[in-house]
Design a protein with these regions (language model features):
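C-terminal binding/interaction regions
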Residues: 2-4, 87-128, 132
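Glycine-rich phosphate/diphosphate-binding loops and the adjacent beta-loop-alpha structural elements
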Residues: 63-69, 73, 101-106, 110
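Positively charged, small/polar-rich N-terminal and surface patches that mediate targeting and assembly
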Residues: 7-66, 74-82, 94, 118-134
Length: 134
C-alpha cells in the first residue's frame, strides 16, 4: 500500500500520475474492486461488543449501536471505501484491515448513519472502473 497526503488534492493527483508514469502503468489497468460482503448489524448486544472490543485500542463498538461490516477485493480498496464512508456520514471506524486478499472494515454509528456510510462506500467502489480481477 502506498499513500500520499497533502492539503492540496491537485498535488496528490499529480503525485499519483508521476508514480504511475515511473512504474509504466496506467490508471485504466487497475483491478476493479469487487464487494465480497456488506452486512449491517443493528442493536449490537453488549456481549458482542465486548468480544469485538477485546483487542481494540482506539474506537470501540458501543452496545446498542449499529455496525457495518464491509469486505472488498483487492484489499487496498478498503481504505478508499472507509474514506468515502467517513465523508458520507458521521461514523466511527472500529477496525480496518487492508492486508491479504480482502480488505475489511467495521464501522459503528446510529442506524441511519451506518446506512448513509454503507451507501457512500458501496456507490464509490462500484463507480470505479478497471479490469476484472484475477
Amino acid at each position: 500500500m502506498f499513500e500520499v497526503h497533502s492539503r492540496s488534492q491537485a498535488e496528490v493527483l499529480e503525485a499519483g500520475r508521476i508514480v504511475l508514469d515511473r512504474l509504466e502503468l496506467r490508471q485504466q489497468e487497475r483491478i476493479k474492486p469487487a464487494l465480497a460482503s456488506v452486512q449491517v448489524i443493528t442493536n449490537v448486544d453488549p456481549y458482542q461488543a465486548q468480544l469485538i472490543n477485546r483487542f481494540r485500542r482506539g474506537s470501540m463498538l458501543v452496545p446498542g449501536r449499529t455496525m457495518l461490516v464491509l469486505e472488498v477485493a483487492p484489499a487496498a480498496y478498503i481504505n478508499f471505501a472507509a474514506n468515502e464512508a467517513e465523508k458520507g456520514a458521521s461514523i466511527e471506524i472500529v477496525h480496518i484491515s487492508g492486508l491479504g486478499r480482502f480488505g475489511r472494515m467495521w464501522l459503528s454509528g446510529t442506524e441511519s448513519e451506518i446506512m448513509q456510510a454503507r451507501d457512500a462506500a458501496v456507490n464509490a467502489l462500484e463507480a470505479l472502473d478497471g479490469v476484472t480481477g484475477r
